[in-house]
Amino acid sequence: TATRGECKGTSHWVDFAWDNPEVTFADILEVFGELPIPPYLNRDTEESDKETYQTVYSKIKGSVAAPTAGLHFTPRVLDALQEKGIDLEELTLHVGAGTFKPVKSEEIEGHEMHTEYISVNRSTIKKLIDHDGYAIAVGTTSVRTLESLYHIGVTLAENPYATEEELRVKQWQPYEKYDQIPPVVALQKILGYLDRNGLETLHTSTQIIIAPGYNYKIVKAMVTNFHQPQSTLLLLVSAFVKGNWHTIYD
């Protein structure tokens, strides 16, 4: 059974209950859930989408939608990139349902960003530190993850013993911190945190909203698709190109 609970902003808590302890919530979603696809496809979800509407490198279940920029990367393309000496690193962001939520408020301050869970391996963070060239993010999911790393590092620079709750990136946090540090230093702070806690992977969450006025710290280039009007992803792109997104879309 599903029972609607407390209302929080434009969202609701929903309580799920079932009798069989051997059945997981993931099992229930597989049976009763429907894979969400972008509205611009103008069609219903098809059974084949479970296989074809996925990136070839996806491994961990948890997102409500595929990171669509990654759909363009076939095994052949990935092999060609590596043959050219381009290093490929993987990270995880579990895309939240809020990725489909348009901005309806008059001012961006009135939009509540969704929380997404991220995981980044120590080896990836170390490569970002040692890498002299561009860090190219594939998709806005990777952008949000990489940029969140910087702000996690800023938190650790202020408090090396920050709790898991304190490491979570809040929506407006990037715009409230004025004592900035170099990206390499921020990433080194994360490595120090992993060392102190005997961890190989950083697990946390982010509510970051990237909008015009945001100063990118780690991402130097990105691969992304076109985005819907009123989308927070369009704000992210606008911030990256300093408001010149109209030229790109024209």
Please give the residue ranges for each predicted region:
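Surface-exposed, charge/polar-rich loops and edge strands
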Residues: T1-D250
